[in-house]
Amino acid sequence: MAEDIQAKIKNYQTAPFDSRFPNQNQTRNCWQNYLDFHRCEKAMTAKGGDVSVCEWYRRVYKSLCPISWVSTWDDRRAEGTFPGKI
């Protein structure tokens, strides 16, 4: 168990610098990467491609976004009331 945690800590990567979002407030960065992940996932699924290429966006938004925001956005996408264009 402790070895698993140590391995996760060793392999953990945070979001890299993105020059589109140079300021300290990363809210827009979080939102954009959430949208980019779901757009990429939708496009790759439609093409029959490998969705794993979208994993970078997922890792970034999981690192930046609060869990409550992500769960709310996921719920709204499921209900069809999500405000973003995916």
UniProtKB/Swiss-Prot annotation:
Pfam families xrefs: COX6B
Signal sequence interval, chain numbering: none
The keyword Mitochondrion appears for this protein: yes
Compartments it resides in: Mitochondrion inner membrane
Membrane topology field: Peripheral membrane protein
Residue span(s) of domain CHCH: 27-73
N-acetylalanine modified-residue sites: A2
Source species, domain of life: Eukaryota
Example GO biological process: oxidative phosphorylation
Residues carrying N6-acetyllysine: K62
S-S bonds: C30-C65, C40-C54
Keyword Disulfide bond: yes
Motif placement: Cx10C motif: 54-65
Pathway where it operates: Energy metabolism; oxidative phosphorylation
InterPro entries with a match to the protein in the record: COX6B-like, CX6/COA6-like_sf, Cyt_c_oxidase_su6B
Residue span of motif Cx9C motif: 30-40
PANTHER family in UniProt: CYTOCHROME C OXIDASE SUBUNIT 6B (PTHR11387)
Subunit structure: Component of the cytochrome c oxidase (complex IV, CIV), a multisubunit enzyme composed of 14 subunits. The complex is composed of a catalytic core of 3 subunits MT-CO1, MT-CO2 and MT-CO3, encoded in the mitochondrial DNA, and 11 supernumerary subunits COX4I1 (or COX4I2), COX5A, COX5B, COX6A2 (or COX6A1), COX6B1 (or COX6B2), COX6C, COX7A1 (or COX7A2), COX7B, COX7C, COX8B and NDUFA4, which are encoded in the nuclear genome.
Family under the similarity heading: Belongs to the cytochrome c oxidase subunit 6B family.
Entry protein name: Cytochrome c oxidase subunit 6B1
Gene name linked to the record: COX6B1
